[in-house]
């Protein structure tokens, strides 16, 4: 498989499908893969689940995919700066799974390692734990978090190894 492509559009051409889950790198609006997000938008794929620490802003980052209504669910730790996200969520048009930032990173790490779930104290006693298994270890309560595995990961890089 050739891992070097001439454009973001070319890189996504044969791998993007409706209903996929994709993870997006960056933090806030820093280091986000703008070209890949635009290329994903241009594929027209729908019913996507986005894993990202934020929902972008109107017209930028994941905001582009929200404006075209391609995202059906967000798994995120922060969504507060996107008016279109807010509109869709409050209208019941968009699913949201809030996940604390550290837990989000661990869910992706665990998924990449083949670990299906893990327990954490983060979120115990909050809405984050609603509907999730709670167990007690050594007198402390922990919430079980299911790992995340994306179909596609979009990252921004300056330099990569082609091997």
Spans of features found by a protein language model:
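Conserved alpha/beta enzyme-core scaffold
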Residues: 1-163
């Amino acid at each position: 498989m050739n891992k070097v492509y001439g454009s973001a559009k070319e890189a996504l051409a044969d791998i993007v499908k409706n209903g996929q889950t994709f993870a997006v790198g960056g933090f806030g609006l820093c280091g986000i893969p703008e070209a890949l997000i635009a290329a994903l938008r241009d594929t027209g794929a729908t019913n996507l689940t986005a894993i990202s620490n934020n929902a972008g802003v109107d017209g930028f980052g994941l905001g582009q995919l929200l404006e075209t209504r391609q995202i059906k669910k967000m798994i995120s730790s922060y969504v507060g700066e996107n008016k279109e996200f807010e509109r869709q969520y409050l209208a019941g048009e968009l699913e949201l799974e809030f996940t604390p930032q550290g837990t989000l990173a661990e869910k992706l790490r665990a998924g990449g390692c083949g670990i299906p779930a893990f327990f954490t104290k983060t979120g115990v006693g909050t809405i984050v734990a609603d509907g999730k298994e709670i167990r007690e270890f050594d007198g402390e309560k922990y919430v079980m978090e299911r790992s995340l595995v994306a179909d596609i990961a979009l990252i921004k890089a300056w330099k990569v190894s082609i091997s």
